[in-house]
Regions:
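Conserved catalytic region of serine esterases and O-acyltransferases that act on ester linkages
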Residues: 165
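Alpha-helical cap/lid subdomain in secreted, periplasmic
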Residues: 55-161
Length: 165
């Protein structure tokens, strides 16, 4: 049996094909999986709520997990993020799947924004009971402990190949 995972987000989801990288990591652990992605550059989760294909895929895709990734640069406002997550997690649960929040990282030179982003993800995960993948926090920890590895792509926002690994 294959684990089915839907990723919903923007360029932080499709950059370096994050769903395929996640699938490869799961396969290394002996977990067979199939990933699907709905991602549009620059989109907020609020925009995905308005997209009929998103609700259709959640409802009829027979997914085990649905991973939600919010717009990161700029991040917020939190109220819109919270509203979109509440709506999406309701749809996900109605489809008998588990919601997962994929926390992103702050832009290069704006590390001070990470605590705000982290707090918002943690708060809505707690309120909705969604699983939290604290990628942004782990990303910064790795970056601090490995300063010679360039984690950012040239745009200073997206992950480089090393930052996605």
């Amino acid at each position: 049996m294959k684990l089915r995972i839907l990723f919903i987000g923007n360029s932080h989801t499709y950059y370096n094909d994050m769903p395929a990288l996640a699938a490869a990591e799961l396969e290394k652990q002996g977990i067979r999986c199939e990933v699907t992605m709905i991602a549009h550059g620059g989109w907020f989760l609020e925009q995905h709520v308005q997209e009929p294909d998103v609700k259709f895929n959640i409802r009829y895709g027979h997914y085990d997990y649905v991973v939600l990734q919010e717009h990161a640069h700029p991040f917020g406002p939190e109220e819109k993020f919270y509203g979109a997550v509440r709506c999406l997690t309701e749809w996900i649960r109605q489809a008998s799947a588990r919601p997962v929040l994929y926390m992103t990282w702050a832009k290069k030179g704006e590390e001070g924004e990470q605590p705000r982003m982290s707090a918002a993800y943690r708060e809505i995960a707690r309120k909705t009971g969604a699983l939290l993948a604290p990628v942004g926090e782990l990303w910064w920890e790795y970056r601090r402990s490995h300063p010679k590895i360039e984690m950012y792509d040239g745009d200073g926002a997206h992950a480089s190949a090393a930052g996605s690994a």
